[in-house]
Amino acid sequence: MCDDEVAALVVDNGSGMCKAGFAGDDAPRAVFPSIVGRPRHQGVMVGMGQKDSYVGDEAQSKRGILTLKYPIEHGIITNWDDMEKIWHHTFYNELRVAPEEHPVLLTEAPLNPKANREKMTQIMFETFNSPAMYVAIQAVLSLYASGRTTGIVLDSGDGVSHTVPIYEGYALPHAILRLDLAGRDLTDYLMKILTERGYSFTTTAEREIVRDIKEKLCYVALDFEQEMATAAASTSLEKSYELPDGQVITIGNERFRCPESLFQPSFLGMESSGIHETVYNSIMKCDVDIRKDLYANIVMSGGTTMYPGIADRMQKEITALAPSTIKIKIIAPPERKYSVWIGGSILASLSTFQQMWISKEEYDESGPGIVHRKCF
């Protein structure tokens, strides 16, 4: 199994997007939405070769006639049949490889149910006959990608956000905090506040339009109250967006009200602390001697940290919470959307990592439970 010729596959299955490619590459080859779509209507044209389900970009392009489902919610796989379709699509259509010939590195959110990880292992070995596999924690991979061994990672994707403090390469499990507030909640919130403007978005396909509006136009205000005042006083913050049917809509304070919920979850009716408090609480759960190093290495990763202005706002909020003498540094690399995948690519190509793989033999001997012993 240790032949260097065989490239390992790295698959970062996010709640919103699936990133896949080969270990040693500097970017994923395939990035597509983690969606499975099924037709809402009866097929009437014979010979069209209609399928009973579509995955990823194809589902996205035919979304007008499909019901779209995300098999991963809050980082946890809730629909295994659909998940299998996504993996099948990843290996055979996107990467065009035979999964039985390559070891696979999968990723997972911290504090996920153990059964989730066992089932992933089982499917890889029994359905796809992988020769070897490994499950890595997403935030740890982001730190690898930033070239550090110490820091606290705030990883916020589509389904889940979490803060993971890591010191000299060791994750500190007692201080890991998880926040089930991420991109999908922001998309839903934007759908809601756009309704107040008189634009109605309800179907699963329309949610994808709103997600696009969010990604293109939203930003984080440095001072929310002041920004609200500016928006009320003038139209300088308004932007327009053209819908697929040609209708043009205008959005103003929604642009920063939407991502503000990351800092004020009460906007979503959630009784939890914002991402800045979560980072601070996570640091405070660590030993007093290592806090200084964590404050100086706050690494952001994941698509929901891509909003313009988020790093400056984070700096401001953490500075207000932390002791006044302490140095605070927010690291927000431009490729942070893919830093989990990039970290996986680095990890899977390290020579020292090659003995960490769970092989098919080990799996056949011990069953799915082996994943807890061999993967952090």
Curated annotation (Swiss-Prot):
Matching InterPro entries: Actin, Actin/actin-like_CS, Actin_CS, ATPase_NBD
Record GO terms (molecular function): ATP binding; hydrolase activity
EC number: 3.6.4.-
One GO CC term, this protein: cytoskeleton
CDD domains, per database record: ASKHA_NBD_actin
Catalytic activity: ATP + H2O = ADP + phosphate + H(+)
Modifications after synthesis and translation: Oxidation of Met-45 to form methionine sulfoxide promotes actin filament depolymerization. Methionine sulfoxide is produced stereospecifically, but it is not known whether the (S)-S-oxide or the (R)-S-oxide is produced.
Residues recorded with modification N-acetylaspartate: 3
Tissue: Muscle.
Protein name: Actin-2, muscle-specific
Organism from which the protein derives: Bactrocera dorsalis (Oriental fruit fly)
